[in-house]
């Protein structure tokens, strides 16, 4: 029997319609029960969630920048209004992650959340749970905008945050809050908003589940290779700086250089341009930072550098140092 064209069109349309992208009530309730608010020095700083390692040790996973110093202690508030003491157990400033120790007996009643194996693909719907705008835990939807690892300068660590991008609204106090997929697995931690000229750009910086899992399993202070300054693509420079560089120059200019940091000790000055690292040309910041983070902190590299007003390149020996050693 041949179906009329109109019916065939309707069947095709319905079969291609997107499925409901929301979370089930069961998942929302389970994630809310395992989510917490994090208070430092009596002030609400952001969110977090209960997680377990492979040995069933219980922690709270949150963002490191909620803490003013690693000596701070915290109070966590659960969905039922109870509060519990928590202390910093481990942290990773390169991914802005922190693990908090809590009483495992008291916290066991709230359950814990599993972590996904990897970053979801672009356009995948994911959901942020956190005390946005100082409210009770809200559920804010978003979509993965770029599943590749990006690096953004992060003032709280004076280093770079490795993250992926999520599109959607991102109010204050969402930091430390978890992002979950439709199965309720953690796919990342909220860290901040990429700012536009006026307010938020609508892009969130979210650390990967792989980085969170690594910290949970190691439960140690990370050693993230640091530069001791910030680097920028040369095409973002002011015209005055471009006019002092060789024509068609490519690389990353440095601004600022932090006093007594690795760049300063290597003799690199503000507005110097890093052209290559170990013979590999670097034009975008992720290219250089990926090379630096491919080796342990304390590793040596050779940069090729051009200074404003100079036409020649010079080799510079560079030694990275861990970001975490300067957080006191």
Regions found by a protein language model. Give the residues of each.
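C-terminal cap/linker of serine protease catalytic domains
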Residues: 21-28, 108, 132, 182, ...
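Protease-domain processing segments flanking chymotrypsin-fold serine proteases, especially trypsin-like
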Residues: 11, 16-45
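Conserved active-site neighborhood of the chymotrypsin/trypsin-like protease fold
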Residues: 42-45, 55-138, 163-164, 173, ...
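Gly/Ser-enriched beta-turn/beta-hairpin loop segments
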Residues: 91-95, 147-164, 219-223, 235-251
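Active-site region of chymotrypsin-like
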Residues: 32-39, 103-112, 138-205, 209-210, ...
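Short, well-ordered loop/turn sites that connect or cap secondary structure elements
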Residues: 67-68, 119-121, 180, 268, ...
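Terminal peptide-recognition signature
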Residues: 36-38, 48-49, 57-62, 86, ...
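PDZ/PDZ-like groove recognition
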Residues: 220-276, 280-287, 291, 306-322, ...
